């Protein structure tokens, strides 16, 4: 009996050691920042990221939102319909033609061209859905400025600015979140919020990349 108890204790200890090892190497059990980055990658429509490349992949995927954020701030300060229209055209182009995406091309030619950097390929459907939504916001703001509906333009600009900030530095993309909700992936959408700790796997409808 004593030997059996000792054997069970050894097995339990080995299992706990294995669990700790997995926790140290898995994005799920890592820091809150790692969890935020992992959830953002999944929300974008990509598969489970490896912890070793997670920071580089996250940085690559936030390159476009940061350019959009700078453009939105400039457009608001200048109240320029031309700037918002140009931004909208670039975003819709990126959604319709994901391979020649100008944002990804710029990243791959600069940061992505460095040794060991993560390179961007064609965007999955959730990311393209977010680009479409952002492009629609930009075009709507441009039209409102032209039409002289300043209050409505300011409201949309505030929403666009908040969404751009969330995607660029907050680990949350309103467009991809809305995409998953529209396609009935409610549990998955909630599980990929920046603060979510859910380790379960969900069947996701629609196109996703590994």
Q: Where in this protein do the model-derived segments appear?
A:
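Extreme N-terminal basic, low-complexity initiation segments
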Residues: 1-5
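Membrane-interfacial helix-loop segments of redox and metal-homeostasis proteins
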Residues: 7-208
């Amino acid at each position: 009996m004593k030997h059996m108890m000792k054997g069970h204790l050894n097995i339990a200890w080995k299992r706990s050691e294995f669990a700790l090892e997995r926790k140290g190497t898995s994005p799920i059990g890592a820091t809150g920042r790692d969890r935020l980055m992992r959830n953002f990658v999944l929300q974008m429509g990509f598969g489970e990221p490896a912890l070793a490349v997670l920071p580089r992949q996250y940085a690559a995927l936030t390159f476009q939102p940061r350019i959009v954020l700078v453009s939105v701030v400039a457009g608001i300060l200048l109240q320029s319909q031309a700037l918002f229209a140009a931004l909208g055209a670039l975003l819709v182009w990126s959604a319709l033609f994901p391979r020649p995406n100008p944002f990804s091309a710029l990243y791959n030619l600069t940061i992505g061209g460095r040794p060991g950097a993560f390179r961007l390929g064609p965007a999955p459907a959730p990311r393209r859905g977010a680009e479409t939504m952002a492009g629609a916001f930009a075009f709507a703001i441009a039209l409102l400025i032209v039409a002289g509906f300043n209050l409505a333009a300011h409201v949309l600009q505030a929403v666009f600015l908040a969404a751009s900030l969330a995607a660029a530095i907050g680990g949350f993309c309103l467009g991809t979140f809305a995409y998953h909700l529209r396609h009935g992936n409610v549990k998955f959408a909630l599980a990929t919020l920046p603060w979510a700790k859910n380790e379960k796997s969900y069947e996701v409808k629609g196109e996703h990349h590994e």
